[in-house]
């Protein structure tokens, strides 16, 4: 039986995710910012991989935003504010296997506009 297109896309995304995830790690002073997007919501979290703890997160569902380029900037502003409160200015960006365009690129640009370096 043939694999559906949606399952194939997700399988390939997970394959990219695992390949990249083996190469990048975050620390307490330079955490890894990982994103997840669904059709309805966008999530981002800053992770300290040495301890396995989430330092800060931003949830698009709680902010009441949709997944589009303009609304994702609000999620980035929220996360940047939380990171600055923790005195974190540099991060490692983990796009989680998603292609760097559209809402992912918009999120990354908004983080840079809010003073987060990567």
Curated annotation (Swiss-Prot):
SUPFAM superfamilies: Translational machinery components. Pfam families: Ribosomal_L18p. GO terms for biological process: translation. InterPro entries: Ribosomal_uL18_bac-type, Ribosomal_uL18_bac/euk. Keywords: Ribonucleoprotein, Ribosomal protein, RNA-binding, rRNA-binding. GO terms for cellular component: cytosolic large ribosomal subunit. GO terms for molecular function: 5S rRNA binding; structural constituent of ribosome. HAMAP family: Ribosomal_uL18_B (MF_01337_B). Belongs to the universal ribosomal protein uL18 family. This is one of the proteins that bind and probably mediate the attachment of the 5S RNA into the large ribosomal subunit, where it forms part of the central protuberance. NCBIfam families: L18_bact. Part of the 50S ribosomal subunit; part of the 5S rRNA/L5/L18/L25 subcomplex. Contacts the 5S and 23S rRNAs. This is Large ribosomal subunit protein uL18.
């Amino acid at each position: 039986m043939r694999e559906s297109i949606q399952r194939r896309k997700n399988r390939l995304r997970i394959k990219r995710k695992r390949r990249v995830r083996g190469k990048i790690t975050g620390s307490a002073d330079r955490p890894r910012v990982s994103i997840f997007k669904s059709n309805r919501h966008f999530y981002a979290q800053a992770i300290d991989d040495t301890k396995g703890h989430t330092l800060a997160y931003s949830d698009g569902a709680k902010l009441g935003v949709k997944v589009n380029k303009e609304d994702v900037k609000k999620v980035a502003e929220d996360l940047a504010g939380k990171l600055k409160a923790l005195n974190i200015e540099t991060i490692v960006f983990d796009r989680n296997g998603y292609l760097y365009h559209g809402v992912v690129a918009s999120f990354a640009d908004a983080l840079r506009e809010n003073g987060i370096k990567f």
